[in-house]
Amino acid sequence: MCLIKTIKINELEKCYITNILKEDKVVIKILYKESKNSFLFKKYNYYSPYEDYKYIKDKLNTSPLGIYVLTSSSTESLNIMINEGFHSFLTKEIAENYKSKLLNDSRAILCKCIIPKGSTIVYNDSEIVSNQIIFIEELK
């Protein structure tokens, strides 16, 4: 999953590619859920559909942001691609739409996550990528 952010060239001087969060932000993440072997009670593993990164509830996860400038023939805008970091959605509706159209997989579930205050983020109209995230709970 990659986030693409387009910046108009005439706005480049007053635009930052990244921002620092001033307060915690609730986001929605799509994860795969699979049951673990347990004799006494049901346990699950949660992991990223794209990178197989394992998430543990209430644990702070950190990652660098991989930010790349894409070449373009346009003289009006610049496309920035972020392919490293924790990719999430800004709303549950956007995540549900993405899940139903592109991830038609019974293992895929929506999860509530928090990007903590002080995290570095990049966002567009629907997605957000951060260098830190905490998996809170599975959404029903």
Predicted regions and their residues:
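Conserved NAD+-utilizing ADP-ribose enzyme module
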Residues: 1-86, 92-140
